[in-house]
Amino acid sequence: MAKKGIFISARVHPGESNSSWMMKGVIDFLVSSTPEARALRDNFVFKIVPILNPDGVINGNYRCSLSGQDLNRRWKTPNKVLHPVNFAVKRLIRSFMKEREVLMYCDLHGHSRRKNIFMYGNNIKEAPHSSRVFPYILSKLCDFFSFEQSRFSLSRAKEGTARIAMFRELNIPNIFTMEASFCGADRGELKDLHFTTDNLQTMGKRLLEALIVYSGIPVNKD
């Protein structure tokens, strides 16, 4: 049986450096020698884009690219010249889909107004619970991830975001924007504390652990 695909991206908004710390947690865990990491590598093919907006990061922009574009509003019909990374990533996704079934796309972000870590997903009328299962599992593995704050909708105003554009492209339930507060948590062991870089890296690790639980893949700990 062909391995299923997982696509994870971050830093489309240059100022959201907390997304890079979550991504570091993802990558460090994925390349580790733990039984869980081996199980993930044995069962999935991962495509990872750590920085979607490198020009914006290098030049110190907060939200936009060098062309003054919010790239997370340009996924629907990206321009090869103005939005080259979006254009290339959509081509990569299409190629990936031809190779194998894609199980999940997750785009990592930072949030400046809300506390905790949470997800935005898509509401699928025919199967409304299908997009909620993975975030619910994640909430049971990490007490500063909030399922209650997670939202699921298909808003016309958000059609240009990766979450909705990739849903139109892939037509699968597990397409998420994961948002980490610039502040901290108001629940669990980190209540009333700021998130540290270690906390954010832990969140990246928990994301992959939730994938193990969700997919039911065996973990050989011998």
List each model region and its residues.
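Structured catalytic-domain cores with a bias toward divalent-metal coordination
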Residues: 1-222
